UniProtKB/Swiss-Prot annotation:
Protein name: Packaging enzyme P4
Name of the top EC class for this enzyme: hydrolase
Catalytic reaction(s) noted: a ribonucleoside 5'-triphosphate + H2O = a ribonucleoside 5'-diphosphate + phosphate + H(+)
Known EC number: 3.6.1.15
Gene designation: P4
Length: 332
């Protein structure tokens, strides 16, 4: 099924704009204060909404890569270079590691990948050949599948796939579409995992990666996003248990795969931490309804998009063919 912009997503545009316009999250890039350029993310949202308006809400066959829709995909304010950067023990692509000092706002709950889960990151992991991508696409079924750092395979041909090449692009899609209520997954964070420098833990992963996951999770919490990230440490089954334990104990929610099935879970929910699958996976339950008998309402944030009211007579009320709602008018 292609990515579809529904009434519920449109209703979230104003909320997303408020979150993006709020005080910027305090970040550290290579040890120096910086901030995210949220204008880039709002521009991306506007571009995606405009494309959806031309196709009745469906983004089937539409290229929504940030590199295609935006002139500049850099979302970090660029600090001045220092000679000390060359000797830094941390190097994440071109931007360096960043940190988010604690939560900037209260988390909200989501219904994906499990009921009542807090906004942020859920790590999907497993040993080599454990079926992580199978679990992601057949059991969790995300609305948007970000493909990053993986070799070409059948999943790249899915209508939900968005192909990116940088950390900035990954954050633009996760925050931009995640803040609108889409279930977003990243397959995978291999470029982050393999390019970090520093001492490795017993599981073979650079220790700073665990804090990086927490930082990214706190960043997504600021914008009400629930994102599943595939972690592929390329270790055997014995070591993956250690890695899972480290992630579960000190960073983010986690799902462990084995032989194409979910073997263990730990979700951070509004009822506390839930271990070992007591909270079932909830694929598609957070998917906004396309047949609500409501009209599209005009948005306050015209800088992102404005939606003309929908005439009741143009709504496919029975929605028997599962087609997107018709009659929507988007304008920028």
């Amino acid at each position: 099924m292609p990515i579809v912009v529904t009434q519920a997503h449109i209703d979230r545009v104003g909320i997303a704009a408020d979150l993006l316009d709020a005080s910027p999250v305090s970040l550290q890039v290579l040890g120096r204060p910086t901030a995210i350029n949220t204008v880039v993310i709002k521009t991306y949202i506007a571009a995606v909404m405009e494309l959806a308006s031309k196709q009745g809400g469906s983004l089937a066959g539409v290229d929504i890569r940030p590199s295609v829709l935006l002139k500049d995909t850099a979302i970090f304010t660029k600090p001045k270079a220092k000679s000390a950067d060359v000797e830094s023990d941390v190097d994440v692509l071109d931007t360096g590691i960043y940190s988010v000092p604690g939560l900037a706002r209260k988390p909200v709950t989501h219904r994906w990948p499990s009921e009542g889960i807090y906004s942020g990151v859920t790590a999907l992991m497993g040993a080599t050949g454990s079926g992580k991508s199978i679990t992601l696409n057949e059991k969790l079924r995300p609305d948007v599948l970000i493909r990053w750092g993986e070799v070409a395979e059948a999943y790249d041909e899915l209508d939900t796939a968005v192909h990116i090449s940088t950390l900035d692009e990954m954050l633009i899609v996760c925050i931009g579409l995640g803040a609108l209520g889409f279930n977003v997954a990243v397959d995978s964070v291999r470029p982050l995992l393999f390019r970090l420098k520093g001492a490795a833990s017993a599981g073979g992963i650079v220790a700073v990666f665990y804090s990086l996951l927490t930082d990214i999770s706190n960043l997504f919490t600021q914008y009400d996003c629930s994102v599943v990230m595939v972690v592929n440490p390329m270790v055997d089954a014995e070591k993956i248990e250690y890695v899972f334990g480290q992630v579960m104990a000190s960073t983010v929610g986690a799902i462990l795969c084995a032989d194409g099935n979910v073997s263990r879970t730990m979700f951070r929910t509004n009822k506390g931490r839930i271990f070992n699958g007591a909270a079932p996976l909830a694929a598609d339950t957070h998917m906004p309804s396309m047949d609500r008998p409501t009209s599209m309402k005009a948005l306050d944030h015209t800088s992102i998009a404005s939606v003309a009211p929908l005439e009741r007579g143009s709504v496919d009320t029975d929605d028997r063919n599962s087609a997107p709602r018709r009659g929507a008018n988007f304008s920028l």
